[in-house]
Amino acid sequence: MTISQQAFLRDAMRRLNLTRDVFATRIGVKRRALDTWLLPEGSQEFRAMPEVVQRFVSEIVQNGVLLEKYTQSVQDGPLRERIAVEGKNQLLSVDQFTRESVEDLFRVADMMQPIARRQKVSRVLEGAVLGNLFFEASTRTRVSFGSAFCRLGGSVCDTTGFTFSSMAKGESIYDTSRVMSGYVDAMVIRHPDQGSVAEFARATNIPVVNGGDGPGEHPSQALLDLYTILTEFSRLGKLLDGAHIAMVGDLKYGRTVHSLIKLMALYKNVKFSLVSPQGLEMPSYIIEQASRNGNIIEQKTSLAEGLAGADVIYATRVQKERFANEENEGYTPDFQINRAIIDAYCGPDTIVMHPLPRDSRPGANDLSVDLNHDPRLAIFRQTDNGIPIRMAIFAVLLGVEGLVQHSLPFFIIVLLFITKGCITYIHNDTLFDCRQTVMT
């Protein structure tokens, strides 16, 4: 089975680095027609792309090496080998990625979208077990990783908090990692100490994903954030090259911004406005790394200076659990991002993002709830993208991304659960005879 029409077109636009408007002109169609082709299959306004257009797009992508230096061929080896850590299929830092490998992962995520939306079903990880080892509080990340693994047919074992771990009895990270490796096929680890996830990973050969290591990194969050930005920019007719990104809040301890700015630094001529209270600035070593590719870094202490003209505003929660008492003094209500601030300094196509959770209590120095119904607020579209991105991560690290293309339509799987005996159906113009006895 080929990839979906939506994934095919997104891949073409990314490979050619074109906005929707320019891409539509390039292939000789109206923007409105392209928009209907990019909708999820099954939606009311979805339209099938004519075969002649599909052939034309394929020819452009194959022959039009407009940005060949940005495009990674599959002939260069499997993606998991290109992002491997010391020969191991693990995801510990965004430093493992090039721009090409990021976009290759996003192509896999595009393929996962109909499975994430439950329009199709995949069982490629059936029998595999994920160990979610969270030694620090988490809701979204833990559930998102678990859901992603289950969407591919696997099962999940959860461990949360030090008090429920043998590490509370003095067990070492090394011992814990070695023991868990015998129980599960992959691990996602969150730990309050920077560098601890890498220590877990060194003790095992199974895939390990960094779910957040103290103030260090959060690579899967950065990947889903970048995927969201590129998806929103495609809709708005923008490119990340040359964009203005404002990051606001606790930039010292906020691991999501540490990973995201390094990932976006793979693009060119990006302007980063880093807005934070004094004492909570972005670490200097990250600023130095983000300054490559002609990117501009400006550090600000007020929202008015940092938000003006921003294409993306990325707000972060105050990491009070990592503060020394005196560090909290500089964080005032002046750093609350609300609708009045956005209207005053930003345009109608600014994207407002947040890794969540946000402090929604009245007067909190965070992203205000008065933006909840503002179309510029992308935080829930952002969280929705966590499932396909994390599905893509698991598929790549476990080497099953190619098998996902053989996923069955969701309605056929439903029939298997409600019908006994022999089921015959047609899928992609091929006759299948499924012999499976199902309990009712």
What is each model feature region?
Residues 1-16, 54:
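A short, Lys/Arg-rich alpha-helix, primarily the initiator
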Residues 48-68:
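DNA major-groove recognition helix of helix-turn-helix/homeodomain DNA-binding modules
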Residues 140-147, 238-315:
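Glycine-rich phosphate/diphosphate-binding loop of Rossmann-like nucleotide-binding domains
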Residues 23-24:
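Short alpha-helical "recognition helix" segments of helix-turn-helix
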Residues 290-369:
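Rossmann-like adenosine-cofactor binding region
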Residues 78-143:
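Positively charged, low-complexity intrinsically disordered leader regions
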Residues 29-48:
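Recognition helix of helix-turn-helix/homeodomain-like DNA-binding domains
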Residues 123-230, 360:
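Phosphate/diphosphate ligand-binding glycine-rich loop within oxidoreductases
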